[in-house]
A protein has these predicted regions:
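N-terminal subdomain of nucleotide-sugar transferases
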Residues: 1-57, 96-98, 124-127, 265-271
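A short, charged, and often flexible helix/loop element on the N-terminal side
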Residues: 56-89, 107, 164-173
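Short N-terminal targeting/anchoring amphipathic segment
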Residues: 92-113, 128-134
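Active-site proximal beta-strand in glycosyltransferases
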Residues: 102-104, 120-164, 191-193
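Membrane-proximal helix-turn-helix segments that form the acceptor-binding/catalytic region
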Residues: 124, 152-192, 205-208, 212
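A short helix/loop element that forms part of the nucleotide-sugar donor recognition site in Leloir-type
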Residues: 178, 226-239
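Carbohydrate-associated surface elements
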Residues: 198, 219
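Conserved donor-binding/catalytic core segment of Leloir-type glycosyltransferases
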Residues: 239-258, 264-268
Length: 282
């Protein structure tokens, strides 16, 4: 909660994300919203996609048909984060009415908002921003995960992932979009938060390296996830006592981003050893 305080004052906080209450970041945003209000602060959530939530202080500004058009235009033009004019106006209007002391941004990709007018408005009003980076999108030309590519350190272009999400069918606009992001973010009053040291290190390799960067790990529900007796767990999972255990945790683990292929390769290398692979969330 310290991030939301300023000169001893409990700030009025607006959280912005693609989702609310659903998906990984949407759940995080809703939990923050609930915690902030229970701590005696004023809080609101603006989100762009998903079902409309009928709770006070939660506003869906995204227009579904416009999101679909945005996704189509991205595929045709190679540009993303620069359409959805009507949805973006609704978001800016809400900010005008709510008058937050601080804005906490999470994800702004996924075809639901126009970055330029939104970020220029926030800078014009001099609203401090805490921005949690859950991926690499805001300092690359387009990539949520750049893998081994370090093109974002210079100017992007010749993108090896141009056909990946956010997908372009024809044009590589990554050099142009990275230039836009540098223009929008370089002079912004911005505190970046990452959920891992790895991502913080990647941010420090980018044009945002001089911004304040903090690592705050994602929280867990300790009533569900907590230490248990290892022997009891082995018995429950039918793992022999003399077997080693390799644990892999990820949703959709066989997707390229989650690295499931490395688990399979490791399993093949260790197939003759006394080892058990345990996959969680796969």
């Amino acid at each position: 909660m310290e991030l939301y305080d300023q000169d001893g004052k409990k700030n009025r906080v607006l959280l912005i994300d693609v989702n609310c209450k659903h998906s990984s970041t949407g759940k995080i945003v809703y939990e923050l919203f609930d915690r902030i209000r229970r701590d005696g602060r004023s809080a609101a959530v603006c989100y762009g996609r998903g079902e409309r939530i009928k709770e006070q202080g939660i506003y869906k500004f995204g227009i579904d048909w416009e999101t679909n058009v945005h996704a189509l235009l991205t595929r045709i033009t190679g540009l993303n984060g620069c359409f959805s004019a009507f949805s973006t106006r609704r978001l800016i209007r809400y900010i005008e009415e709510y008058q937050p002391d601080m804005i906490h941004i999470h994800e702004l990709h996924a075809y639901f908002v126009n970055l330029k007018p939104l970020l220029r408005y926030i800078k014009k009003k001099r609203i401090p921003v805490v921005w949690t980076f859950h991926c690499e999108y805001m300092y690359t030309g387009k990539c949520g995960h750049a893998y081994e590519c370090l093109g974002f350190q210079k100017s992007c272009g010749n993108c090896p992932s141009v056909h990946d999400y956010p997908k372009s069918l024809f044009l590589d606009q990554t050099k142009r979009m990275l230039h836009w992001k540098k223009e929008l973010l370089s002079d912004m009053d911005l505190h970046i938060v990452t959920p891992s040291k790895w991502l913080a290190n990647r941010v420090q390799m980018s044009f945002l390296k001089d911004k304040q960067i903090s690592v705050i790990h994602n929280g867990i529900d300790t009533s569900v996830f907590h230490p248990v007796d290892a022997c009891d767990l082995r018995e429950q999972l039918n793992i022999p006592k003399d077997y080693k255990v390799v644990l892999a945790i990820a949703p959709d683990i066989m997707s390229e981003q989650k690295g499931g292929k490395w688990v399979l390769q490791l399993a093949e290398l260790m197939k003759d050893e006394k080892v058990m692979f345990v996959l969680v969330g796969a």
